[in-house]
Amino acid sequence: MTTLSKRPWIAWIRVVLPIVVMILLAGHFYRSLSALDDLDAGAMIASIPVWAWCGSGTLYLVGISASAFFWRLLLNGCGHNPPFISTIRAFFVSQAGKYAPGKGLALLIRAALLRTHGVPMTLSLATGIIEVLWTMAVGSLFALTIYTILECTGSSSTSADPWLPFKLLALTCVTAVPAYPAWSIRLARASARKLGLDPGEFDFRLGWQSLLAGAAVLACGWICLTLSLILLIAGMAPAKAFPLILPAMAWVPLASVGGFVASTPGGIGVREYLIEQALLPHLGANQALLAALLLRLIWTVAEAVAALVLWLGWRDSVPMQVQHSNPADQKS
C-alpha cells in the first residue's frame, strides 16, 4: 500500500484546496471587473502600443527558455545529448499540459517527445521535476535577495504588504529545501514511481559549478519575466514603468512561485491576484487589474504561438541508431 493511499486526506486536500482557491479568486476578479468601466478598460487596452504587446510576449519566451536550457543541462549531466531544437520543442509544446489538474501532464509530454531521441521516459521525467524545483527555488531566492537589497538600501518601497518578507522567506524555504540535489533526485524518483514508471537508477554527473551556472541562467530568466511585465506597464503608463523595475523583480517571482505552490492549473488566479495587489498602490485599481489580466493573456498567447511554430515547423528526424537503440532504454 502506498503512502498516499494510507493518507487519503492528503489526496483530498490536493484536490479540494486548489478548487476552493480558484472559487475565491474568481469571486474577487468578478467583483473587480464588475466595478471596472467597460469604456475605460477598452480605451486603456486600445492605447497599449504594438511594441508593448510583442515585446512583453518575446521577453516571456526568452525568460522561460532559461528553464529549457537548465533542463538540457540536466540531461547532459545524465549522459544524454538530444538535439537542441528537439529539447526546446519538447519544452514549449509541453507547456499546454500545465493547465491540466496536477503537475504531471506537462512533464509526461516532455518525456514522450524526447523518447525518440533515445532519452528514457523516466530520465526525462526525473530531470524535468528537478528543473521545475530549481526554477521555483531560484525564483524565490532571487525575489528575497532583491527585496532585502531594496529594504537595506532604503530604496522605494517594494510593496505596501507588511507580510511580504515573510511570504518571500516562506516560499524560499518551501522551494529551496526540495531543490537540494540529493533530495530533488530522490523526490524525482518517487514522483516517477507514483506515475507508474520504474525510476531505476540514473548516473547524475552534474557538479556544483554546472548547477550554479544553470542557476545563474535561471536568474536571468526571472529578470526577463519581470521585464515582460515592465514593458506592458510601459505601454499602459510610461511614466510609472521605470521606477517599478527593481520592486517588480520581487513581485513576479513571488506571484509565479506562489501560483505553483497553490497548485491551481498553470497558477491561474493566484498569480494574477498577487501581481494585482503588488501593482495596486502604484497604478491604481483599474490599471493594476488590467495589467495582471493582460499579462496572463500575453504569456498564454506567446506560449501557444511558440508551441505551434515549433510543433509544425520542426519535425523530429529520428537517427537510425536511435531507432535501433538499446532495448533496455526502450523498456525504460
Please annotate each region the language model reported.
Residues 1-92, 148-260, 282-285, 290-292, ...:
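Predominantly cytoplasmic-facing regulatory/coupling regions of multi-pass membrane proteins
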Residues 66-69, 100-111, 259-275:
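Transmembrane helix boundary and interhelical junction motifs in multipass membrane proteins
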Residues 76-77, 110-118, 278-280:
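Helix-loop junctions at the membrane interface of multi-pass solute transporters
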Residues 84-89, 103-108, 115-132, 284-294:
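Membrane-interface alpha-helices at helix entry/exit sites of multi-pass transporters
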Residues 95-104, 132-144:
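Mid-bilayer segments of alpha-helical transmembrane spans in multi-pass integral membrane proteins
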Residues 96, 130-133, 257, 297:
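Transmembrane alpha-helical cores of Major Facilitator Superfamily
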